[in-house]
Every structure is written in C-alpha cells, then in structure tokens.
Amino acid sequence: NDVKEFAPTYHKIDYQKIDKGQLLEINIFDLHFGKLCWGLETGDNYDTKIARKRFLNAISAIISRAKGYDIKRVLFPIGNDFFNSDDLNNQTTAGTPQDEDVRWQKTFRAGRQLLIDGIDMLSQIAPVDVVVVQGNHDWERSFYVGDVLDCWYNKNENVNVNNNPTPRKHYKFGNCLISYTHGNNEKVSD
C-alpha cells in the first residue's frame, strides 16, 4: 500500500448533478494487446499500434454516441484477455505459445499506458468504476495491471478500481446487478 502515496494528483472534476442518470458501460474485451498477426497469413494485420488505435477509437466512438444522455457513472471492465500472453515466454496462463509483437516488458508498459489513457478519457464524462476481470490468456498480468491502476488512481476521486482477486465480479447500479467473469472456467451448471 505504500506505493499509493506516490500516486499522481488528479483534480476532482465537478460533474453535472444528475439524480436519475444512466450507467455507461464500455466493455472492450479480448483486445489481446501484444498479439502479432501477419495479414497474408491470418487475413488481417495486428500489432500493438493497431490494438492501441482500435481501443481508443472504440472509446471515442462510444463517448460520441453517449452524448445527449445523462451519464451518472461509467463502468469500465478491463482484463478479459486485455493482454495476449501472461509470461516471459510469450505463453498464455495455461502455457499455449503466442506470437507477440514486442518484449513482454514493453507490452506491459504500453498496455498500462493505454488503460490509463482510456480511463482518463472516460473520467471526463462521469466518475469511472474500473472492474478487473482476469482472462485465460492473461490471468496474472491482468491482476498486475489492475494493481498498478489501483495505485495510480489512489488519489483520484473520479476513479475507483476493483481488483479483487475473485474470478467473478459484481457491480450494482440502481436496481441492476451486473456480473462479470471471463467464462473460460464456467459451466452451464454454475
């Protein structure tokens, strides 16, 4: 917890007072940040630059569509295979080899910055609740980046990060309960 005291200072945003506003949920799942694809082999090129552009374009497009709505809060679940691999050998959590764009350290740092950029964009609309949902490709890295975000936004009253180490996360808004899990370990009987 001592790292939190070094968190950057964000100024509190005075949002418009909304009594019965709506929740804006932005769920960009399976980004597989760090994945490398060659278009002639896979049908489409993909790398960290393309992933970053798609991620930020998706957030911008959803923000644009949400104009005119009274947004009370933003719910931003992250993880869900945000990263393509989980270890220094470029493997998933289960050990499946992956084609990676760059070194794992560079991927982690670039992914961390991408999430910060996205959260900062969203926090201009309304307070943001970040929920970390670990995936089958990036179980550990999702937790690590969630911990970094929790520390980073510690002094930011506009952002809350839920990085509890449970595979299922729950979020209540008004009379609605929204639940998340990556789904790779769920069974119909669950």
Question: Can you say where each PLM-predicted feature lies in the sequence?
Answer:
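Extended recognition/assembly regions associated with phosphoester-bond processing machinery
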Residues: 1-190
